[in-house]
Design a protein with these regions (language model features):
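A short Gly-Trp-Pro
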Residues: 2-121
Length: 121
C-alpha cells in the first residue's frame, strides 16, 4: 500500500470504509480512460464499462481483468453483500451487485477515494 494516502483514503482501503453517496470526485467523470487502485496502481476498470447507476458511487459493469480483483462475502450492516477487493494490495474498493446493465448484469459500486483515473491520450 502506498505511503502518501490521505486519512480518508486509508479508511476506505484498509478499514473498509464507504464515502458518502454523491460525494466522490469521480462519480460524474465522463472522460475516456482507465481507473486504477489508489493503494497500488493496479489497473481495475475502463471508462468503457462505467455508467450512471444513480447509486451515488462510480459504477461499472465489468473490470478490465477479473483477475485484478477478489470477491469476499460481507455480512456487515445487517446485509449480505459481495465486497470487491484489489488483488494486489488487499484494498477495499466497494461492492458488486446483480442489478447492473447488459452485458454482465453486474454493478460494481466503487468508492471514488479508492480509485485514481488516467485519461486516455
Amino acid at each position: 500500500m502506498k505511503k502518501n494516502l490521505t486519512e480518508e483514503e486509508l479508511h476506505i482501503l484498509k478499514n473498509k470504509g464507504t464515502e458518502k453517496p454523491f460525494s466522490g470526485k469521480l462519480l460524474y467523470n465522463k472522460k475516456k480512460g482507465t481507473y486504477y487502485c489508489k493503494g497500488c496502481d493496479n489497473e481495475l476498470f475502463s471508462s468503457k464499462s462505467k455508467y450512471d447507476s444513480g447509486s451515488g458511487w462510480p459504477s461499472f459493469y465489468e473490470p478490465i481483468n477479473i483477475n485484478s480483483i477478489v470477491f469476499k462475502k460481507d455480512i456487515s450492516l445487517g446485509m449480505i453483500r459481495t465486497e470487491v477487493i484489489c488483488k494486489n494490495c488487499d484494498g477495499h474498493l466497494g461492492h458488486v451487485f446483480d442489478d447492473g446493465p447488459n452485458p454482465t448484469g453486474k454493478r460494481y459500486c466503487i468508492n471514488s477515494l479508492s480509485l485514481n483515473f488516467n485519461k486516455d491520450e
